[in-house]
């Protein structure tokens, strides 16, 4: 957990794999994207191995585990298949996320409060392999407190509602929800990360929230990389969030 206003950038490379899978080719290579991201200042690499394998594949994860210089944040659904795979690869960080086949992207946070026994068992099992387990949840006090009860050392607050807000009042309301969620998480002794839907025009307000440890960002980076290259996209984002955090 950071003790200053310095904030970490986790780069999600899922959508590099999305582009590859669209044509069933061997390119673009998400592993190369990860290495480029590290060179440009990424503090970690996030990948989500979905049940439907729509983007990242097992081979990608295995290769990344061998070559990353930073650390892997492995996003996964709470299924026996994924639990067994995580035990095999032993990533530094694991983030448990909700997952349905029909969704375009992760649509909301994990309902920890509604399934505490199941999530607690998963956290305990994954902690035994040495992984730091976080839970991807909405910035809701009930879910944050439940995350503490099940033994997770970290949470990732879902910023999608903030990213999707249309009017200034909606943006302010959703940003305040995140601010409050960070405060509750820190009061519970949790490491607080955040992510989902963040891009170059909305990230600074979130990066300026004191106490956030890491922001995980993917789609916006991959999209911007079409015009400036992946290293350039990551470097720009890193500069934005560090500047915003320094001003806070």
Swiss-Prot record:
Reactions that this protein is recorded to catalyse: 3-amino-2-oxopropyl phosphate + 1-deoxy-D-xylulose 5-phosphate = pyridoxine 5'-phosphate + phosphate + 2 H2O + H(+)
CDD domains cross-referenced by the UniProt entry: PNPsynthase
Chief localization: cytoplasm
Active site: 48 (proton acceptor), 75 (proton acceptor), 196 (proton donor)
Localisation: Cytoplasm
EC number: 2.6.99.2
GO molecular function: pyridoxine 5'-phosphate synthase activity
BP terms from Gene Ontology: pyridoxine biosynthetic process
Positions annotated to bind 1-deoxy-D-xylulose 5-phosphate: 14-15, 50, 55, 105
Family indicated by similarity: Belongs to the PNP synthase family.
Protein name: Pyridoxine 5'-phosphate synthase
Taxonomic source organism: Pseudomonas fluorescens (strain ATCC BAA-477 / NRRL B-23932 / Pf-5)
Gene that this sequence comes from: pdxJ
